[in-house]
């Protein structure tokens, strides 16, 4: 009897755990969740470090950095990568413009999720190309996809954030914490912690990318493809099951 009772308790706890996990997955594993925001920010830091180290010192997400690098190169007459940086900035802007024009379409959950598929494809192709391929054909296409993703995913629970560069997120972190200190309202503390998580995700992505480049070289970017493809398949599977 005692053994049977223990088994029932085990099954009870197992069922409870399973129910909690289902609720967690349903709540957090979607395209406008804080989890996915951190995942995208991790990928942005990862890709920025990758292109900076392996593709001519150009950033695909941090366009402020590209402006600074471009200015320095102009002054020192280092014109080798100027065209790449200009094309990268224009491609990023074009990605933002395109999603802004098509915003009514991408407000739908399914279309919004599929907007990461070009980034998955480009990262897969880039990892397959040798370093003899000019950076002009590598970096701007990635920047375009980053502009698309940055615009398609920019809000979580009414909180506007940026998954591509950190200056705005740094400001919002301090504003949220400062407002919490002044008002003692918990939502501001939670918002500040969310932005801390975003900052940590970006830094972690850059560190992981820098480390893995030592071993995987140009193929390092495949990790971004793998992460985003797994999430894309997961979300599409959820969508099909609900139909």
Please give the residue ranges for each predicted region.
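Helix-to-loop junctions at the C-terminal end of transmembrane segments
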Residues: 97-108, 213
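Hydrophobic/small/kink-forming positions within alpha-helical transmembrane segments
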Residues: 93-97, 199, 203
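Hydrophobic core of transmembrane alpha-helices in multi-pass small-molecule transporters
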Residues: 42, 47, 135-162
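Perimembrane loop-to-helix junctions flanking transmembrane segments
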Residues: 62-79
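C-terminal ends and interior cores of transmembrane alpha-helices
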Residues: 121-133
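Short, Lys/Arg-rich, polar N-terminal cytosolic tail immediately upstream
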Residues: 12-31
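Cytoplasmic-side transmembrane-helix entry/capping segments in multi-pass membrane proteins
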Residues: 109-118, 138-141, 162-165
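A membrane-interface helix-boundary motif in multi-pass transporters
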Residues: 109-113, 210-226
